[in-house]
């Protein structure tokens, strides 16, 4: 694991319907992420937050809400993440809603030719403007990173696609729209739903996921949406879905990722302090970060 790490926050809530997730980066910092990682021996550089332009009024372009502002912020993020990679540091991005994965993945994939992606998420984030029931771009970043959807999203960073379907794994899915299910089947993407986790156990699921995502890749990006966890353990998220990954399953999955030593970047998204209880979800995010970055009890 690269011990030189750069943190960047993205106070973005325009990709989602519920306000408040723009305060996620501040909540995670307040929960002590820098101190925790420094105690683990990381050299931390906090680059502050990406500036997100706020719209003067509601806009929607071909079933994409706030398209201009989301694209602008993600282009900035892609450049910052690319600069971090150029400096030989590990980018840790704090959200913000999950639309910021557009910029994170665009910045990382410029430097990692065959990028793998592991998503811990209740949702697929595989919608396009043609399939999205809501028009919220936080439900589209994985599709766009694969090259599906509006060209302004697919071309963030100046190129498309960023990743191949065979190099992506979703873990913890339990709420997929019809268009997402059809796309998953059409492109043959590896998805471990909560059914597989319940049936096989998280350890076996992670063994299979790690083997799959590291087979033909040069590095792996972790995209962790806190709604992947059960709302009992992570209540402060905008789109909670009951029956999710437990707190301990989350730690096991990330401890196994740490042992595999395949990560080149990570993002933690969808922490919404307005919906949280005593910053519980931000504290869970920091605890999970400590596991994925190698913290051990013994």
Swiss-Prot record:
GO terms for molecular function: arginase activity; manganese ion binding. Mn(2+) 2 binds at residues 121, 123, 225, 227. Binds 2 manganese ions per subunit. InterPro entries: Arginase, Ureohydrolase, Ureohydrolase_dom_sf, Ureohydrolase_Mn_BS. GO terms for cellular component: cytoplasm. Substrate binds at residues 123-127, 134-136, 177, 239, 270. Keywords: Arginine metabolism, Hydrolase, Manganese, Metal-binding. It catalyses: L-arginine + H2O = urea + L-ornithine. It holds the Pfam family Arginase. Its EC number is 3.5.3.1. Mn(2+) 1 binds at residues 98, 121, 125, 225. The keyword Transcription does not apply. It comes from the Bacteria. GO terms for biological process: arginine catabolic process to ornithine; urea cycle. The keyword Methyltransferase does not apply. Pathway: Nitrogen metabolism; urea cycle; L-ornithine and urea from L-arginine: step 1/1. Its cofactor is Mn(2+). Belongs to the arginase family. NCBIfam families: rocF_arginase (TIGR01229). This is Arginase. The lineage of its organism: Bacteria, Bacillati, Bacillota, Bacilli, Bacillales. The gene is rocF.
């Amino acid at each position: 694991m690269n011990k030189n790490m750069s943190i960047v926050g993205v106070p973005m809530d325009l990709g989602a319907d519920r306000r408040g997730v723009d305060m996620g980066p501040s909540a995670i910092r307040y929960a002590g992420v820098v101190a925790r990682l420094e105690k683990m021996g990381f050299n931390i550089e906090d680059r502050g937050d990406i500036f997100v332009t706020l719209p003067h009024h509601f806009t929607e372009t071909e079933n994409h809400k706030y398209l201009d502002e989301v694209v602008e912020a993600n282009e900035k993020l892609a450049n910052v993440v690319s600069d971090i990679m150029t400096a030989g540091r590990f980018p840790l991005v704090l959200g913000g809603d999950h639309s910021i994965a557009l910029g994170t993945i665009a910045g990382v994939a410029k430097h990692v030719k065959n990028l793998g992606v592991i998503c811990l998420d209740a949702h697929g984030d595989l919608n396009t403007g043609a399939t999205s029931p809501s028009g919220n771009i936080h439900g589209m970043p994985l599709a766009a990173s694969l090259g599906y959807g509006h060209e302004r999203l697919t071309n963030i960073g100046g190129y498309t696609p960023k990743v191949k379907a065979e190099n992506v794994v979703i873990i913890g899915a339990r709420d997929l729209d019809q268009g997402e299910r059809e796309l998953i089947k059409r492109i043959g993407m590896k998805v471990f739903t909560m059914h597989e986790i319940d049936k096989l156990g998280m350890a076996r699921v992670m063994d299979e996921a790690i083997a799959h995502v590291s087979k033909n890749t040069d590095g792996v990006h972790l995209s962790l949406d806190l709604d992947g966890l059960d709302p009992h353990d992570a209540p402060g998220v905008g789109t909670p879905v009951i029956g999710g990954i437990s707190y301990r399953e989350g730690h096991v999955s990330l401890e196994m990722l740490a042992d595999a030593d395949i990560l080149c970047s990570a993002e933690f998204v969808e922490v919404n302090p307005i919906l949280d209880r005593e910053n519980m979800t931000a504290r869970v995010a920091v605890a999970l970060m400590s596991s994925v970055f190698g913290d051990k009890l013994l």
